[in-house]
Amino acid sequence: MKRFSDLNQIDISKLEVFFQPAKKTKKQTVVFAHGFSVFHSYFQSFYKTLTDYDYYAPLWPGHNVNGFDYKELSPIHYGELLAAFIENKDLENIVLIGHSMGAAVCSYAMNLLNAKRVEKLILLAPLSYCNLLRYFKIKSSFKKDKAERMANFKAMFQTKFSNLTDENSWENELSKHSKMAKKLSNNILKELPVLNKTYKNLKLPVFLVLAQNDLFMPTKLTLSYFNKYLIKNNNLQSSVILNSEHQMFNSKYESFCKAMDDILNHNKLSKIY
């Protein structure tokens, strides 16, 4: 796709965004960038606790409800959409959170945004070159037996397809989603050099949260890589959530909430939770 430097040129008219308004006096605005092959609701165990924050979660093409064009399946394009959305809504005082692929999307968006809009960036199990060391494990996820793939798909997308009742409809949606995911994974590999480089440009406070038992990335190497090579402006705090998996907000909910409370309310992060 054509790349844009002027955010006004980016069409966000079809971008679907989930919004949860603050129930109390708003502290800040949280914007969440979801990861690969998921629906935004996989983060709901945590975002439902954000009663003091306006909460936005854009749905990237391929993961949204109302259809997409295959040329839109691009993390770089998602970053452009994210930046254009924030500028268009004139959002300020933002806590920007990205999980997995979404972390790289956030990092790319920061290169396009007015940096003063975002107060802190939270990277949850971020996509980087380190993921290549788990490439074959990631690839094998596409080759699980049909029953397992269907069970995982239903668990992740039940909210999106709540109207589906028969198995044939579910199988049709899974087939379409699998085709999308393979195309997007190929584009992630193509765009990874650009995405990886954007982390080096981050100047705002950054909080890196990793899962101890992450199947999609080598946790210790990722921790070292970000601290030694990617973010070297003394603006990075990092932590590992013990006994957690890639979606640490679901596998170790209480520990994750403690880490997020420290970040959101105290601007600090312990080494482990």
From Swiss-Prot:
Q: Which UniProt keywords apply?
A: Hydrolase, Serine esterase
Q: Which organism is it from?
A: Mycoplasma genitalium (strain ATCC 33530 / DSM 19775 / NCTC 10195 / G37) (Mycoplasmoides genitalium)
What SUPFAM superfamilies does this protein's entry cite? alpha/beta-Hydrolases (SSF53474)
Q: Which residues form the active site?
A: H34, S100
Q: Which InterPro entries match?
A: AB_hydrolase_1, AB_hydrolase_fold
The cross-references to Pfam families, in alphabetical order and at most eight, read: Abhydrolase_6 (PF12697)
Tell me the GO molecular function terms: carboxylic ester hydrolase activity
Name of the molecule in the record: Putative esterase/lipase 3
What's the EC number here?
3.1.-.-
Q: Does the keyword Hydrolase apply?
A: yes
Q: Give the similarity note.
A: Belongs to the lipase/esterase LIP3/BchO family.
